[in-house]
Amino acid sequence: MTFPALSVLDLVPVRSDQRTGDALAASRSLARTADAAGYTRYWVAEHHNMPAVAATNPPVLIAILAGATARIRLGSGGVMLPNHAPLVVAEQFALLEAAFPGRIDLGIGRAPGSDPVTSWALRHGAGGVDDDAVARFPSYVDNVIAMMSPGGVGLQV
């Protein structure tokens, strides 16, 4: 009998009686348990301005979890690409892959990942308001792929 590959999706929940550091410790423990149990992948999400969720920065969480585990693949489920410069996403995940070869997965999404005010703050903080970021999602994906390819960069602007 063949069993399906098992994965975990972690939002890093912060309970009402819990500090964020305790929630991160619980996620590290869960990742270690999933790794030891033979799970295939551990996904972390990206959500902003939600006090009950500590998963605001997938690359940072992935680095924390990769340092606490030995085998399990770690990925973003996903990075909300309209909120980030494609170059930054490509660099972050290339660096993670270099540090933890064969264990890093980049999952991306085009949703804002938050309420409109928070989405505006994320994009405005990156150097300007970009109301067309979601519409340009396909070109952002192409740019990330190009920047992560061994042949170099061919940006679409």
Predicted regions and their residues:
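Generic structural signal for well-ordered secondary structure
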Residues: A54-P58, P82, V89
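The substrate-binding groove and active-site-proximal loops of carbohydrate-active enzymes
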Residues: G75-N83
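N-terminal beta1-alpha1-beta2 module of alpha/beta enzyme domains
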Residues: M1-I72
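Short, intrinsically disordered, charge-balanced linker/junction segments flanking boundaries
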Residues: V153-V157
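Flexible, glycine-rich active-site loops centered on histidine and acidic residues
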Residues: T2-T20, N83-G152
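Hydrophobic residues within beta-strands of alpha/beta enzymes
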Residues: Y42, L74, I104-L106
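Structural motif
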Residues: A45, G77, G107-G109
